[in-house]
Curated annotation (Swiss-Prot):
GO terms for molecular function: ATP binding; shikimate kinase activity. The gene is aroK. Keywords: Amino-acid biosynthesis, Aromatic amino acid biosynthesis, ATP-binding, Cytoplasm, Kinase, Nucleotide-binding, Transferase. This is Shikimate kinase. Belongs to the GHMP kinase family. Archaeal shikimate kinase subfamily. Pathway: Metabolic intermediate biosynthesis; chorismate biosynthesis; chorismate from D-erythrose 4-phosphate and phosphoenolpyruvate: step 5/7. Its main location: cytoplasm.
Length: 283
């Protein structure tokens, strides 16, 4: 009983920590999970992160465990993951890993694909591993379905789905900044994040992303001028992704190299595309 699945990461349009409502979009950088099950009655689960074998695979092991417990089977399992996403960077690597792990386990069991249940089990696993504050329903759904999702994270409801109407590149900056999770400061800006969220509900995603980035970078002591540098170089929008430290910019292809050059003085730059396809079983 084997299966492999892939899930893309996501970029932030609105970070949900401040208000409980958020939005994200799929990015074409994926995590692949390979699951092999054995009907031996031992319930032994072993995982490995192939790109970072020294790191503990607790999240993906937890995902497999929760799926097997849900279906009340005592199989043993092996799970391995490989990733195009940098870890702990604000690009939803945890959501992508949990989605891929849960989906691959469903596939290995031969169970019917139930999107709501898959998302619930993936988010449950992230909560149990203390990797999320709000449940990250916006990140999880953008990774699972692809495209743009706008969500009430607290109620686990998708308020709207969309895609970018234009052909865009995603330019990702990974600066050497220390991550900062000051929830109290993020809550202080909730009234202003609400204004950015209204832009998002009105499909003004570029303005929403930029405003959100300025607000959260200020609250978390990341430089906001990096986003302005990207705009100056021709990006249609730019901002902090998640709680950082990564920044994302969206650009038409003719300006991508200029935006990349504006970003690269601050750290490593990756060029990607929006992902509108989401998670899927590949074999």
């Amino acid at each position: 009983m084997r299966c492999s699945a892939i899930s893309p990461g996501s970029g932030t349009i609105i970070n949900a920590i401040s208000t409980g409502k958020g939005s994200a979009f799929g990015i074409d950088l994926k995590i692949k999970a390979n699951v092999e099950l054995k009907n031996d009655g031992k319930s032994k689960i072993n995982g490995i992160l192939l790109d970072n074998p020294s790191l503990k695979p607790n999240l993906v092991e937890r995902c497999v465990k929760n799926v097997l417990e849900h279906f009340e089977v005592d199989y043993s399992a092996k799970i391995s993951t490989s990733s195009e996403l940098p870890l702990k960077s604000g690009l939803s690597s945890s959501s992508a890993a949990s989605n891929a792990a849960v989906l691959a386990t469903f596939g290995a069991l031969g169970e019917k694909i139930d999107s709501e249940l898959i998302l619930d089990l993936a988010i449950k696993s992230s909560f149990e591993e203390q990797l999320t504050i709000t449940g990250a329903y916006d990140d999880a759904t953008a990774s699972y379905f692809g495209g743009i999702t706008v969500c009430n994270n607290l109620e686990r409801k998708i308020l709207k789905k969309d895609v970018f109407k234009e052909e865009l590149d995603v330019i990702i900056l990974m600066p050497n900044f220390k991550k900062n999770l000051n929830v109290k400061r993020m809550k202080l800006i909730s009234d202003y994040v609400e204004l950015a969220f209204e832009k998002c509900m009105n499909a003004d995603y570029y303005k929403a992303l930029f405003l959100n980035g300025i607000l959260y970078s200020s609250a978390l002591n990341f430089p906001s001028y990096i986003s302005v540098d990207a705009l100056e170089a021709g990006a249609v929008t730019a901002g902090l992704s998640g709680t950082g430290p990564s920044y994302i910019a969206l650009s038409y292809q003719e300006n991508t190299e200029k935006v990349k050059n504006a970003f690269k003085k601050y750290g490593t730059v990756i060029i990607s595309k929006p992902d509108n396809f989401g998670s899927k079983i590949i074999y």
